């Protein structure tokens, strides 16, 4: 039987998640600043009101992940700065 993984208002700044199965996990109000996710299965996970500042995600499964109301400043996924990508996409959309 699958165990539900819920992180509620946890202070996990600088945490390292390696080779974890966190599919469908719920992160609510969690501080994940400077955290590292490496080889982690996150499909279907939900991140709400979280701090992902300067977090790094490498070789992660992000299928159907939801990130709402989050600080993503400096968030890097597979070497890509997410906030910069969003800013560039918004600029392209307004110039069309």
Language-model features and meaning:
Residues 1-96:
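Tandem repeat scaffolds
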């Amino acid at each position: 039987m699958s165990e539900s993984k819920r992180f509620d208002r946890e202070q996990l700044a600088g945490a390292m998640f390696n080779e974890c199965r966190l599919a469908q996990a719920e992160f609510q109000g969690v501080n994940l600043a400077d955290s590292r996710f490496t080889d982690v299965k996150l499909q279907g996970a939900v991140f709400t009101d979280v701090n992902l500042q300067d977090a790094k995600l490498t070789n992660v499964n992000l299928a159907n992940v939801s990130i709402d109301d989050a600080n993503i400043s400096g968030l890097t996924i597979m070497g890509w700065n997410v906030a910069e990508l969003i800013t560039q996409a918004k600029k392209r959309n307004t110039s069309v």
